[in-house]
Amino acid sequence: MKIVGDSEHFKQPYDSDEEYVSKTEDKRDCEAAQKVGMELVSLSKTQLDKIELDEHLYDSIQQAHKIKPKTEAYRRHMQYIGKLMRNVDVEPIKAALAIVLNKNNNETAKLQMFEKMRERLLSQGDSEIQTLVEHYPQLDRQKLRTLVRQATKELAKGPESKSSKELFKYLRSEIQD
């Protein structure tokens, strides 16, 4: 009769030298990968082209754009994209996704800054022109003054004016931060 002691018989999965990953942790990783896949699906084609993806994953994301959201087929397809994401290293994709999304936020912030400049120019007039020319010497004071006067006259007639748009375009083209 053989007595079984501290042998292989009593070993648990976490007793090995390798790092043990529980089912719960594995599920969390899978859900995180699926969420990254959902973020990729929400991107436009131009944004998606900026991210380096596996060809099969890219095609699946393009197919997801063709499926109507809030349908069972869409849900299954999102799970399939999650499955594909599990086989790919997610970290570089997350980093590229953050860069693409942050770039859009930076562009929006710049546009809002130019919008505020235009509003200040239209409300404060020459004093704001002086401040802007001191801060941004590349601006042409005369052109700025002309655009502000035209925009102010046109704004009295209606909310949208051609000169106001020209002023915005001029500020955006001349000021590079």
From Swiss-Prot:
GO-annotated biological processes = assembly of large subunit precursor of preribosome
Which cell locations does it reside in?
A: Cytoplasm
Give the intrachain disulfide bonds. none
Q: Which InterPro entries match?
A: DarP (IPR006839), DarP_sf (IPR023153)
The keyword RNA-binding is annotated on this UniProt entry: yes
Q: Give the superkingdom in one word.
A: Bacteria
| Main localization category | cytoplasm
GO MF terms here are: ribosome binding; rRNA binding
Name the segments for region: Disordered: 1-26
Pfam families, per the entry: DarP
Keywords carried by this UniProt record: Cytoplasm, Ribosome biogenesis, RNA-binding, rRNA-binding
Cellular component GO terms, alphabetical: cytosol
- Presence of the UniProt keyword Glycoprotein in the record: no
Please explain the role this protein plays, according to its UniProt record: Member of a network of 50S ribosomal subunit biogenesis factors which assembles along the 30S-50S interface, preventing incorrect 23S rRNA structures from forming. Promotes peptidyl transferase center (PTC) maturation.
Q: Which NCBIfam families does the UniProt record give?
A: PRK05255.1-1
- HAMAP family assigned: DarP
Q: Which family does the entry's similarity section mention?
A: Belongs to the DarP family.
> What is the official name of this protein in its record?
Dual-action ribosomal maturation protein DarP
Q: Give the organism, scientific name.
A: Shewanella sp. (strain ANA-3)
